[in-house]
Regions:
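Sec-dependent bacterial lipoprotein signal peptides
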Residues: 1-4
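Non-catalytic macromolecular-recognition regions in eukaryotic signaling proteins
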Residues: 6-178
């Protein structure tokens, strides 16, 4: 009885699929407060009964200042033949996200794709460039607070081109070259 009580804290929020998601970094030019970058394709699921309410999202190992302007979840459109958000600009609402910040989908077996898609809107201060290796996602399931991460990196440049020298400098800070 004691072993069962100490064996875990209940369901958790985690990236969907079988094993950790592939690490990638997206480059996005012309990012500003007036035209935030949108990042999607991040499928999350709950490992047991319950719903996870996302309470905050922060960049992991950022270079420069990144502001998370908005975030929301929706049922994974890939499950019904639709397209995930990917990398865009504009608002999450324009791409079918509501103000929902709850993950209700239970994790499936293997690489089922079961889960809810997380979309994030981010910006950088005027005239600056920034980058991150991924996102720390804080959440609550009932009274249990925890965090998980998703390794979708982003290079966010206020310059009009990813090939502009200040933007290339951010890539180099992550050991990458265009």
């Amino acid at each position: 009885m004691l072993a069962a009580a100490c064996s875990g804290a209940g369901p958790e929020l985690r990236p969907g699929g079988n094993g950790p998601p592939n690490t990638s970094i997206a480059g996005i030019p012309a990012v500003s407060a007036a035209d935030p970058a949108l990042l999607g394709g991040m499928v999350l699921c709950v490992t047991g009964p319950g719903s996870a309410v996302i309470t905050a999202i922060k960049p992991i190992h950022p270079t420069g200042a990144i502001e998370v302007v908005d975030y929301a979840t929706r049922p994974n459109p890939g499950q019904t033949g639709g397209e995930q958000l990917g990398v865009e600009s504009g608002t999450l609402r324009a791409y079918g996200f509501s103000a929902n910040r709850t993950v209700n989908a239970q994790c499936g077996d293997g690489d089922s794709g079961q889960g809810d898609e997380l979309g994030i809107a981010v910006s950088v201060p005027p005239g600056t460039n920034a980058g991150t290796t991924g996102w720390e996602i804080d959440y609550r399931i009932g009274d249990h607070a925890a965090s998980t991460s998703f390794p979708l990196g982003a290079i966010l440049c206020s310059t009009p081109s990813l090939h502009d020298k200040p933007c290339k400098h951010v890539w180099q800070q992550f050991g990458l070259h265009l």
